Amino acid sequence: MSKIKQIIIVEGKTDSDKLKRIYGNDLKTIQTKGLSINKKTLEMIKEFNNKTGVIIFTDPDGAGKKIRQTIIDYLDNKVLNAFIKKDDISKTSKKVGIAEASDDAIKKALDNLIIYDKNNVSLSWTDYINNNFYLKSNRIVICKYFNFDNNISSKTLFKWLNWMNVSIDDIKKIIGEYES
C-alpha cells in the first residue's frame, strides 16, 4: 500500500482513527470538528495545502458538503478531494460518515483523488443547460462516474465540473458510455 504524503482533512476523531487503522499511525490528519470549523483551522489547512498538499475527505452528507465547500472557498490554489457515497456506508450504521465506510470504499476513494482548482472555467452555464447536463438523469450518471453523492444540486455539480476542468465533450462521453 502506498504511503499518503498529503494531510487528510476529516470531520472528526473517529474518521482519523479509521484512516490510521487502515494506513498506519504515520498518516497525518486534521479534524474540522464538524461544521464548527474556524478561521484558525482554515489557516492551518491553507498552510499545509501550500507546503505538502491536503486531501479533503468529508462525510457524504449535507454537513460534509458544506465543510468541503468552506475549505475550497478559503484556499487559493488546487486541492485534492476524496469522495465516498452513502452507498459505501454500512446499512446497519446510524451515522453516515468516513468512520462507517468500508475499508475498500475508503481505499478506492483515496486511490481516485479528484483535483479541484476554483480558477478553472471549462464549461459555461449556457453550455451546461443547452446540453441538458442539469437534468436529474444526467446528473446521476455524472455523479456516479466521479463517485459524488447523487443528491448534489445542479449548481454544485456545474461548479465542481469546472473546478475539475471537465469539458463538454468529456461530459458527453461519460453520459454516452452509460447509455451504451
From Swiss-Prot:
Predominant localisation class: cytoplasm
Per the database record, which ranges form the Toprim domain? 5-90
EC number of the protein: 3.1.26.8
Fetch the SUPFAM superfamilies from UniProt: Toprim domain
Q: Does the keyword Chaperone apply?
A: no
One example of the protein's molecular function in GO is: rRNA binding
Q: Where in the cell is it found?
A: Cytoplasm
Q: EC class of this enzyme?
A: hydrolase
Keyword Transport among record annotations = no
> InterPro entries annotated for this entry?
RNase_M5, RNase_M5_C, TOPRIM_dom, TOPRIM_RNase_M5-like
Which coenzymes or cofactors are required? Mg(2+)
Quick one: a GO cellular component term?
cytoplasm
- Entry superkingdom: Bacteria
Biological processes annotated in GO: rRNA processing
Q: What is the cofactor note?
A: Binds two Mg(2+) per subunit.
What does the UniProt keyword field contain?
Cytoplasm, Endonuclease, Hydrolase, Magnesium, Metal-binding, Nuclease, Ribosome biogenesis, RNA-binding, rRNA processing, rRNA-binding
Q: Which residues bind Mg(2+) 1?
A: E11, D59
- PROSITE patterns the UniProt entry points to: TOPRIM (PS50880)
Which reaction is catalysed here?
A: Endonucleolytic cleavage of RNA, removing 21 and 42 nucleotides, respectively, from the 5'- and 3'-termini of a 5S-rRNA precursor
Q: Where does Mg(2+) 2 bind?
A: D59, D61
* Annotated NCBIfam families: 5S_RNA_mat_M5
Give the family per the record.
Belongs to the ribonuclease M5 family.
Question: Main role?
Answer: Required for correct processing of both the 5' and 3' ends of 5S rRNA precursor. Cleaves both sides of a double-stranded region yielding mature 5S rRNA in one step.
**What's the name of the protein?**
Ribonuclease M5
Native organism is: Mycoplasma capricolum subsp. capricolum (strain California kid / ATCC 27343 / NCTC 10154)
